[in-house]
Structures are given as C-alpha cells and as structure tokens.
Design a protein with these regions (language model features):
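Short acidic N-proximal helix/loop "leader" segments that mark the beginning
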Residues: 1-16
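A short beta-loop-alpha structural element at the N-terminal edge
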Residues: 18-34
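Conserved glycine-rich acetyl-CoA-binding loop
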Residues: 81, 105-116, 128, 141
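Conserved GNAT acetyl-CoA-binding A-motif
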Residues: 125-138
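Conserved catalytic-core motifs of GNAT/GCN5-like acyltransferases
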Residues: 136, 149-171
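C-terminal "cap" of GNAT-fold acetyltransferases
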Residues: 163-210
Length: 217
C-alpha cells in the first residue's frame, strides 16, 4: 500500500485554476507549522496538536521520498504561496486511512478549497487499496460535515470527548465530534454480524446505520 504520486491527485480532486497540490518537503516544515498555528489555533491542544511541532514532521511524516512513514501531508499552493494543508495517517495492519486534520488560509476560503479534503482522503485510500477511510468533523460549525455528506460519506456516530480544543484563549474543553466513513471495498469483503450476537440496543443501532445487513441467524 505505497503512497501515491501527489500529481495524480489533481485528477480525483481538481483545484481551481492557478492552484496545485505538493508534497511537504523538509524545508517547508516551519512554514507548515506556522500555517496550522495561524489558521487553526484550536489545535494547540488535543489530537492534532502534534502538527504544531516540527519534530513530528521530521520523525513521522513522509519527507523527501521516505515512503515507509505513515503520515502524509499535502500542501495546497498558489504560485509560491502556501494556502492549505491536509494531513492523513495510514494504519497498515487494518488497511484504513484516517483524515487527521486540514486547514485553509482565510484569504483563500472563498474558493471552497476545503471541499477537496474528503475527495483527497478517498482518492488516497483507493489508490493504496485501503478498505475504508474515515475522519472527524467538528460540531461547532456545519461546513465540514456538509462536505462529507455531499460526497457520499456516511455519518456513523458522535464521539464524546475523544479530543480537546482551545475554545477561547486559556479555555480548553473536551468536544463532541461527528465521525464519517466511506467504505472502499465490495460488500463481499464483509462478514455480516448475526442478530443473535447483538444486544437489542446494538441491533437497533446497526439497523439504523446499515438497514437489512444483519444476519437473521
């Protein structure tokens, strides 16, 4: 499941004229850290806060051909200007891709560049033969959730307190987030659960999310 060539991503999630994707390089780490800090200050704590540390990129992220690493960071560029960032993480054992965090420069948000995040995550997953892709969406505003739903991702639940955010200067709170997934393999690759193996509450939720898929046995 090698990482794809970033040039091929433009076919799956095309950008407006004048914009392009690039893979993060070692020399761009400081600029990327500063961009996240400026565009998404809430991640100074919590699950995505690693993206504000330069050592995270040097040790964990694909850089200059180090394709064995499990984090992949895509830059959005206009000419020489950095205008957006998307970070994803692969789980080789389960063959799943997690859309970790993305951010767009406020000066370029009118072009709806973040609309490409779900498509990019899916394109990466398909090109690598992943079974599923997933990501989390904030419940503070509806925009990211709307993008996932528009592109056919499924809402499978609300996670309480999985992550923390700085909601205002000096105030850190645990947050609720929506979890969205998209399955990339055929139905035949699944072992369907037996209804007799589920509690009534589990069965009710399963039927709500995946109607007619539980085994009657």
């Amino acid at each position: 499941m090698p990482w794809p060539n970033v040039d091929k991503l433009s076919e799956s999630a095309p950008l407006p004229a004048g914009y392009r994707y690039e893979l993060l390089t070692r020399t761009e780490i400081p600029e990327t850290v500063n961009a996240f800090a400026s565009w998404y200050p809430g991640i100074v704590v919590g699950n995505a806060s690693c993206h504000l540390r330069e050592d995270f990129y040097r040790e964990k992220v694909v850089l200059d051909g180090e394709l064995e690493r499990d984090f992949f960071v895509i830059l959005f560029k206009r000419d020489h200007e950095l205008v957006g960032v998307l970070s994803v993480e692969r789980d080789r054992d389960s063959e799943v891709l997690y859309g970790r965090v993305g951010a767009i420069s406020p000066q370029h948000r009118g072009l709806n560049l973040s609309e490409r995040f779900p498509g990019l995550i899916e394109a990466l997953g398909r090109s690598m033969g992943m079974g599923m892709v997933y990501s989390l969406a904030t419940l503070k505003v509806p925009y990211m959730a709307e993008k996932f739903e528009r592109l056919g991702w499924q809402l499978i639940g609300i996670i309480p307190g999985f992550d923390r955010e700085m909601v205002e200067p000096g105030v850190v709170k645990r947050v609720y987030e929506a979890i969205y997934t998209k399955v990339l393999v055929d139905e035949n690759d699944f072992m369907l659960p037996r209804r007799s193996a589920m509690t009534p509450k589990t069965a009710a939720l399963f039927d709500l999310l995946y109607p007619d898929k539980a085994n009657a046995a």
